[in-house]
């Protein structure tokens, strides 16, 4: 499926992508800032995620939480999210409310700092700390998305530290520290604005120019730290985590080609073969046939610099021990390395991926988000239209070359969750001893 895309850039550097679709009377506004946890420096982590909250706390012309109220009162939905390489904000509104959504996004880009106060900062720091307690510390397996990057990336690497950041860093951050982070990264020349859905192109252009045009470009942002890594870990990395969980779960990561590279598509297809839907290798073998797992999946982080990671995620059945689960997953990965994949497996995986892409592009919100993603990470929103071609070009030989290069035992990082038990000796220690013997 190809979608119409028109793109242009304002004098202040803001890249704008438009995709008209009058199927339904709704329009999506999607703004990606090219800043994520990777842009934070040690001692000042957690700022990108903090701003996911701060940008909803009012600007010079909008009261705290009024952004939510105005959009919802107009019949729309909105949210924001943070990742290692980007932060994004998005609204989907009735077509006649496009001006409102654009004005709100422009106002907080250009007029947030006059309304930023110490009280708001203190309040949102507490909100983030509570979010961490709820979604990470007290959530079963909730620490995986911190611990796996910590295991898979060296401590000097920008992808190593926690996405939500250090609570100590947030507590010690001054208002000036936070304001300077905003001045550096939340600027039009470090952002992509995508609009998709039911709108008139010329009207949208005029609104974008009117609301975003006067915002000055930034002074530039510092370069990321060293990103390049060897293609493999060089060994099997392993960490056992004792947690308040009922069932063991294994996350296994492999260093993988970066998002958008030619080799990435073979890695993505391999992930689909391993863990996409119930017809995948891991699900068929571990869940249906051997019945050692309750669920299995695989996915890439879609990182565009240095190294991506392909992740396998398998949860045990109640009667399966952590050691049995780990052994079973290793056996399936080894079998893939030894036997390779068949062309029909590749074709099935590509069909599933293409179906997902087509379905996503029929949604105004997903369409806008994908244009923003390709524009931010790879420089061109129109790349969304060639993704199906890139996947269709993948053959079994491409996937088998990736498997041979990247899925061996010299390129595995294993994060194994085990149920917490009482006693002087931890479950993690006992498991280590059992496997070692």
Q: Each predicted region: which residue ranges?
A:
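Catalytic glutamate of the conserved HExxH
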Residues: 50, 54
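Short, polar/flexible loop-turn hinges at active-site or ligand-entry regions and domain interfaces
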Residues: 39, 57-61, 110-119
